[in-house]
């Protein structure tokens, strides 16, 4: 916010309610950079605009929001007013009229102005302000009273989450308005209110409210923030007219006034409640029996679906609360699937929340696939799925929180890579290998990951690797060894030749990706980059093969290691990696063999041949080998490509 004015404000007028007829002035802001003269066309247009806003018919004020324009460019004036939803049309008209009469006194020569009152907002500008987000020139007002019987850090958490939930509700509503009652304890409650101008898009309203809500310090018993496009407030009394807005969502229902209405409510609600409870009991028993049956039945080759993971389902409101309504500051990263946020469940457990982008056409299938696949996996080198949410348009995965981000964050940063010496990197290579072996052989299902890369390897507190992002994974049947697809997904730099060119994938496809990953871990360089040697240019795999052929594989080693590594150990890892990236899938080792090769040096290694996607020099192109370089891309992003058969 460019010009937020912040100060402590004692609420001396706490007895004023939304139904009060007296208009209570709060604050105004004038644009001192653009002015007009008293006899100008703009001055005439502004007076016309203000007069029209204050002389509408009664029905116009009942909506609580109106816009208007006067004149032609460059002297056109656009204006609007917004009244609180809980005030009557008479109070709205009174407030707007009062504001109009004060406008030219408070901002006599300014082309832009915004005026805040307890019951309404008035705004005008020489720019188009309709359906346009503006968070400049706001004000933060705060009570001088401290919270009672609640620690300040607890108080902030108690208030912030409901206010963010109210912001989401307001952004989705037609009137862009929401209230909340927040119970601090058995005897203390707070009341919250958020609002936007109804012309804003849902996302603009939510962004505006989040900016405002997070400007408040929440260390006092009451506070509010006023912005041109939105406002929010909380206090320890009902400062809005509850009868006009309905009971706040978090509060308990109050008893009705009429005896007949109470009888009708009891007569209708009790039978419905009993019927509902009976249905819940029946479906619970059936669901339990179904889960028991599913545990006993063998897994079909293609019969897995998201319903088998029903016990993992989260409520969307719980996820919103955990992430503070997907607060931008909690964002951990973003990919083709969507955004990932850090969250804290009500139990105190930290989680990573992966939210499917609503514009992602491919993400919906990958979402259901990831739930089905990961829900069945348990291994120390695989990220753990805690649950999911499938509610309306929302598709969310909840994972264990892994604090050290992904491997690429360390490998390809000149400063961060210093935290990964060779001992740690060797440990990471072994952990990744064991994780893939579990997917291929040791789990109940045979799973091909199809998108193994540094960005999908997370590191925990002890730098142990955890394979993540199973959106592209495929489950193989009992005797299935390979599959074909017209929909090639993954990351080109890590794809095996047979998969990238023909859509054929198998366990050996993951082995190829693992080989590329090992070379990146050893060198600290990206396979997608180009490297020059002997007047020839190639990717990391090509560069490694040339070094190997010249008898100088140690030149691949990350200089950040210094002399703190065993040459024989690193050379063996390079050798294993080259075996993994062989052009012919049959020439690549299995993951079980790779784990054994990494575990003991007693196993002899085969001599590697030129790898797949090998960039050949002019001299090499003269040979009989087929040049595969035309099929190689340096794109790092996970892609989906449909190929004709």
From Swiss-Prot:
One example GO MF annotation: protein serine kinase activity
Domain (Protein kinase): residue spans on this chain: 326-603
Domain of life: Eukaryota
Extracellular-side segments: 21-262
Binding sites annotated in the UniProt record for ATP: 332-340, 354
Induction: By salicylic acid (SA) or by a bacterial pathogen infection.
Keywords: ATP-binding, Glycoprotein, Kinase, Membrane, Nucleotide-binding, Phosphoprotein, Receptor, Repeat, Serine/threonine-protein kinase, Signal, Transferase, Transmembrane, Transmembrane helix
Glycan attachment points: 29, 39, 57, 101, 185, 241, 260
Reactions it catalyzes: L-seryl-[protein] + ATP = O-phospho-L-seryl-[protein] + ADP + H(+); L-threonyl-[protein] + ATP = O-phospho-L-threonyl-[protein] + ADP + H(+)
E.C. designation(s): 2.7.11.-
Record CDD domains: Gnk2-like, STKc_IRAK
Keyword NADP: no
Annotated PROSITE patterns: GNK2, PROTEIN_KINASE_ATP, PROTEIN_KINASE_DOM, PROTEIN_KINASE_ST
Modified residues (Phosphotyrosine): 399, 499
Compositional bias segments (type: Polar residues): 620-632
Subcellular location(s) of the protein: Membrane
Span list, region Disordered: 616-645
Membrane topology designation: Single-pass membrane protein
Membrane-side (Cytoplasmic) residue stretches: 284-645
Cross-referenced PANTHER family: CYSTEINE-RICH RECEPTOR-LIKE PROTEIN KINASE 13-RELATED, RECEPTOR-LIKE SERINE/THREONINE-PROTEIN KINASE SD1-8
Protein name (Swiss-Prot/TrEMBL): Cysteine-rich receptor-like protein kinase 19
Annotated organism of origin: Arabidopsis thaliana (Mouse-ear cress)
Organism taxonomic ancestry: Eukaryota, Viridiplantae, Streptophyta, Embryophyta, Tracheophyta
